[in-house]
From Swiss-Prot:
Domain of life (superkingdom): Bacteria
Keywords: 4Fe-4S, DNA damage, DNA repair, Hydrolase, Iron, Iron-sulfur, Metal-binding
Binding site for [4Fe-4S] cluster: C13, C16, C115, C130
Protein name as catalogued: Type-5 uracil-DNA glycosylase
Effect of D75 to N/Q: Loss of XDG activity, but retains much of its UDG and HDG activities
One GO MF term: metal ion binding
Species whose genome carries this gene: Thermus thermophilus (strain ATCC 27634 / DSM 579 / HB8)
General function of this protein: DNA glycosylase with broad substrate specificity. Can remove uracil from double-stranded DNA containing either a U/G, U/A, U/C or U/T base pair. Can also excise hypoxanthine from double-stranded DNA containing G/I, T/I, and A/I base pairs, xanthine from both double-stranded and single stranded DNA, thymine from G/T mismatched DNA, 5'-hydroxymethyluracil and 5'-fluorouracil.
Amino acid sequence: MDREAFVQTLTACRLCPRLVAWREEVVGRKRAFRGEPYWARPVPGFGDPEARILLFGLAPGAHGSNRTGRPFTGDASGAFLYPLLHEAGLSSKPESLPGDDLRLYGVYLTAAVRCAPPKNKPTPEELRACARWTEVELGLLPEVRVYVALGRIALEALLAHFGLRKSAHPFRHGAHYPLPGGRHLLASYHVSRQNTQTGRLTREMFLEVLMEAKRLAGL
């Protein structure tokens, strides 16, 4: 399956009734975006097709990616992430706006679940259902050498993808686990508002993760 076929098939997915209902139900709920069009479909990844770094998040935000159709775009997570990608030399611009000409260099963004879940909490069944899309999407990125999991659930989804045991690869910010073929798995706190506004994840902490990913990827 090529990239175009993947996007067409993914965005037509309705496997998870709860997620389908929620991604459509939230349209127009937030006053700031009332009247704006919403993507309200599964969100495909975004970035460099020859990426050597993959940033792997949890799921679209109801009024962020679910509205804009681009990962980490339209909410506080993106407002934190993109300036740091730009500072690290991985993005052409310090912000992501729907329909802009933003380019990512050597990095690709996607998530464990591709539809917005209620309370940002996908169920185990929803994670398993979306694992089929992870399999396809990561297969379209053969140059990736460094996988950066944003949060525990994202880490566990990647461990499942690689057939690795959770008990041998616990989540902690800054964790580094070797993968077969000279690849690497890094873990970071998620770039969510909950983490960045409380100081659990600072700009300096995340920039350090990005620079380590660049070093390991040979960028």
